[in-house]
């Protein structure tokens, strides 16, 4: 059962008897065929869809649409936060929700660049306030099934690639400019680090996205489909 925090009258919130969910995305380029809010749009749709199917009361906090995205600064439209600012801000957001009576919170991350800051938020809420918080990147939940869904080889499901484009074609097709999608080879990596979203990387690196391609995309969006997104 989905209940949206910002669409509920304060006296009807009943936060004490709900699971709180916070979706955290970004505002950054997703090449020239997906909107700047792609990560946020996908996170919100996925949270709503899951909450509507849940038997428990799910209280959806106002979605956070600005994250850590300096690696996209070479392209137009990015709005980004420093990690320390993001940790401080989201800790306050979450602690406010707990003070309103929320007993537990799930943070759904829909942008890879947010992970370090969000881990900091979870650590701080747990160590300083004793709060129960779980953090998940939504794509990790289907990692064991993705090989039976994807059409591309490793390197095809990077930033604005087959995976994200398929989800956007499913959830918000009116925002996808399919005429601009061109045919590209899979992105390349090595044994230690690969830009595919489902790669099992052994190291972390900071890589500006203009080093991957001229439009900042990574992967093979031309293999995307709304049918794949629905799966």
Enumerate the predicted regions with their spans.
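Extended, histidine- and acidic-residue-enriched regions that form the cofactor-binding/catalytic faces
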Residues: 1-106, 112-231
């Amino acid at each position: 059962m989905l209940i949206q925090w910002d669409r509920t009258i304060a006296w009807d919130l009943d936060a004490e008897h709900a699971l709180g969910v916070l979706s955290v995305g970004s505002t950054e380029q997703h090449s020239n065929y997906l909107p700047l809010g792609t990560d946020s749009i996908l996170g919100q749709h996925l949270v709503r869809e899951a909450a509507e199917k849940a038997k428990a009361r799910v209280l959806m906090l106002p979605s956070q649409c600005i994250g850590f995205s300096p690696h996209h600064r070479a392209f137009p439209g990015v709005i980004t936060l420093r990690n320390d600012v993001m940790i401080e801000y989201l800790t306050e957001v979450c602690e406010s929700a707990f003070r309103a009576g929320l007993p537990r919170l799930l943070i759904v991350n829909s942008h890879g660049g947010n992970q370090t800051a969000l881990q900091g938020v979870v650590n701080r809420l747990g160590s300083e306030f004793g709060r129960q918080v779980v953090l998940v990147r939504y794509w990790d939940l289907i990692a064991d099934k993705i090989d039976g869904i994807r059409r591309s080889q490793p390197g095809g499901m990077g930033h604005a690639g087959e995976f994200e484009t398929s989800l956007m074609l499913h959830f918000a097709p009116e925002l996808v400019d399919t005429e601009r999608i061109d045919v590209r080879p899979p992105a390349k990596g090595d044994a230690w680090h690969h830009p595919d979203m489902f790669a099992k990387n052994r190291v972390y690196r900071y890589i500006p996205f203009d080093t991957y391609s001229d439009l900042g995309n990574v992967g093979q969006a031309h293999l995307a489909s709304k049918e794949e997104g629905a799966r």
